[in-house]
From Swiss-Prot:
SUPFAM superfamilies: Adenine nucleotide alpha hydrolases-like
Protein name per Swiss-Prot or TrEMBL: Sulfate adenylyltransferase subunit 2
Alphabetized UniProt keyword annotations: ATP-binding, Nucleotide-binding, Nucleotidyltransferase, Transferase
Function according to Swiss-Prot or TrEMBL: With CysN forms the ATP sulfurylase (ATPS) that catalyzes the adenylation of sulfate producing adenosine 5'-phosphosulfate (APS) and diphosphate, the first enzymatic step in sulfur assimilation pathway. APS synthesis involves the formation of a high-energy phosphoric-sulfuric acid anhydride bond driven by GTP hydrolysis by CysN coupled to ATP hydrolysis by CysD.
C-alpha cells in the first residue's frame, strides 16, 4: 500500500471495514442520513461489493423535520442506485406532537432521533449498524472506536470498549448487543470533500451556495423551509447567499454565508476554515444536550 495516495488509503481502509462487517455479522444495516458523509458511505459500499449490490439495507430515521431537498435526494438515490431503503418514524413522537419549536432541540432529538433509532434497530434486530461519524467532528467522537460496542439498551460506555490493534477487530456480540461501525473514523471534513470531488459523488444541493430564505435566530441563520416555522415579532426573512456545512432537522441547522457554488470552491473554502462544521448544529450547543450524553443514550 506504500504507493497509494492519502485518499486511496482511506478508501481502502473503509472498504476493508465494510467487508469485515459483511463477513462477520448476520444482520447489518447502514444508517443513511442523506448527509455528505452518508453519500460517501453509499459510494464506498457500492465499490466494496461491486458488481453485486451492498448485502445490507439502508435505514433512514425520519424526524419529519428534515429539509425537503434531503428527502427528495434520498428517494432519488434509492431509485437510481436500487438499494433497499427502510424509513422509520417514531409514530408515538408524532402523535405527541414532538417538534423542535414546541419542545426544544434536546427533547426533539432524543425522542425523534435517538428513540426512533433504537426502535428501528430493535424492530429489525440489526446486530451491526454503519454510521458516517468522523473523529474530527467532535470530542466524544474523537475517542470512539471504529467498531463501537453497544449494550442491549444501545448505550455506549466509553470505558467499556475494545482495543483495535493492527486492523484486527473484535466483532463478537451476545444476544441483544450490537456494534456501531464507523468506516470514516479517520477521515477529516477536507478528506470528505476532496473525495467527493475526485469521485464526482452526488450530494444534496443544500451544500452548495445559493440565495435562500433565512432568518437570523439565536446566532444562527435558519432557513425557512416550510410553513411550520413561525416567525418571531419583528423577525425578517432575508434572501441571502448561504450554504450548509452539515445537514439535519432544518430548524436546528444553521447555514453559513458562502459563495462556494461548486465542489472546487468548497474544497478551497475548507482549506482556510478554522471552525468545526458542527458549529451550525443547535443540538451540540448546551451541556444538557452534549454529544457524549446522547451517545450514551443510544444516539449514533
Amino acid at each position: 500500500m506504500k504507493n497509494l495516495t492519502h485518499l486511496q488509503r482511506l478508501e481502502a481502509e473503509a472498504i476493508h471495514v465494510f467487508r469485515e462487517v459483511a463477513a462477520t455479522f448476520s444482520n447489518p444495516v447502514m444508517l443513511y442520513s442523506v448527509s455528505k458523509d452518508s453519500s460517501v458511505m453509499l459510494h464506498l459500499a457500492m465499490k466494496a461489493f461491486y458488481p453485486a449490490p451492498p448485502p445490507f439495507p439502508f435505514l433512514h430515521v425520519d424526524t419529519t423535520w428534515k429539509f425537503r431537498e434531503m428527502i427528495e435526494f434520498r428517494d432519488a438515490q434509492a431509485r437510481e442506485k436500487g438499494f433497499e431503503l427502510l424509513v422509520h418514524v417514531n409514530e408515538q413522537g408524532v402523535r405527541d406532537g414532538i417538534g423542535p419549536f414546541t419542545h426544544g432541540s434536546n427533547v426533539h432529538t432524543h425522542i425523534m432521533k435517538t428513540v426512533g433509532l433504537r426502535q428501528a434497530l430493535d424492530k429489525y434486530r440489526f446486530d451491526a449498524a454503519f454510521g458516517g461519524a468522523r473523529r474530527d467532528e467532535e470530542k466524544s467522537r474523537a475517542k470512539e472506536r471504529i467498531f463501537s460496542f453497544r449494550n442491549a439498551q444501545h448505550g455506549w460506555d466509553p470505558k467499556n470498549q475494545r482495543p483495535e490493534m493492527w486492523k484486527i477487530y473484535n466483532t463478537r456480540v451476545s444476544k441483544g448487543e450490537s456494534i456501531r461501525v464507523f468506516p470514516l473514523s479517520n477521515w477529516t471534513e477536507l478528506d470528505i470533500w476532496q473525495y467527493i470531488l475526485q469521485e464526482n459523488i452526488p450530494i444534496v444541493p443544500l451544500y452548495f451556495a445559493a440565495r435562500r430564505p433565512v432568518v437570523e435566530r439565536d446566532g444562527m441563520l435558519i432557513m425557512v423551509d416550510d410553513d411550520r416555522m413561525k416567525l418571531r415579532p419583528g423577525e425578517p426573512v432575508e434572501n441571502r447567499l448561504v450554504r450548509f456545512r452539515t445537514l439535519g432537522c432544518y430548524p436546528l441547522t444553521g447555514a453559513i454565508p458562502s459563495s462556494a457554488a461548486n465542489l472546487s470552491d468548497i474544497v478551497e473554502e475548507m482549506l482556510i476554515a478554522r471552525t468545526s462544521e458542527r458549529q451550525g448544529r443547535a443540538i451540540d450547543r448546551d451541556e444538557a444536550g452534549s454529544m457524549e450524553k446522547k451517545k450514551r443514550e443510544g444516539y449514533f
